[in-house]
Design a protein with these regions (language model features):
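Hydrophobic alpha-helical membrane-embedded segments
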Residues: 52-75, 150-154
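Cytosolic juxtamembrane helix at the C-terminal end of the final transmembrane segment
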Residues: 153-166
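Alpha-helical transmembrane segments, especially those used as permease/efflux helices
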Residues: 55, 59-60, 104, 112, ...
Length: 166
């Protein structure tokens, strides 16, 4: 099996900002969980309230590892990566520089996913915490975040496609 080499680039500035925002949102989720537990408003949902930030922190850690070691993963274990078809269409030209830039831009989407995971973590923590007092979950807020994330991912992939196919 031939080793695929790409020209390595650092993350885009926007991706770095999205990573910081996502990590801050997860930190806020932890702070909210501790707040709801310290106010002692929740008796039976203590475990669920701590599991939400813990699970989202674990997923964020995995995403950060994939983003950090993206080139190593692609070069040594390409079968582990599920890249969008746009990457392979760009790669038809065999231009390593162009392919490396596109590969790097694809991981901006991973940074965006990290940010939306942080937002969902906050919403779930708020939902569980406020549900103990008012019994009104935030169901519609989940749908809005998921819809915005789907549209955002589509728009970023479209931007990548237009940039490299023109």
């Amino acid at each position: 099996m031939a080793v695929k080499k790409l020209q390595r680039y650092g993350l885009e500035k926007g991706a770095k900002i999205l990573i910081v925002v996502g990590l801050l949102l997860i930190l806020i989720s932890w702070i909210l969980a501790v707040h709801y537990l310290s106010v002692n408003q929740i008796a039976k949902d203590r475990l669920a309230l701590l599991l939400i930030p813990l699970i989202f922190t674990a997923v964020a850690a995995i995403l950060l590892l994939v983003i950090k070691y993206r080139y190593t993963l692609f070069e040594k274990y390409p079968y582990l990566m599920n890249l969008p078809s746009i990457f392979y269409r760009i790669g038809e030209g065999k231009d390593k520089k162009k392919k490396g830039i596109a590969f790097n831009m694809i991981f901006t989407v991973h940074s965006l996913v990290l940010t939306f995971l942080g937002l969902l973590s906050i919403l779930l923590t708020l939902s569980i915490g406020s549900n103990a007092k008012t019994s009104s979950p935030f169901f519609y807020s989940y749908f809005i975040v998921i819809a915005v994330s789907i549209v955002s991912v589509f728009l970023i992939y479209r931007r990548i496609y237009i940039k490299f196919m023109s």
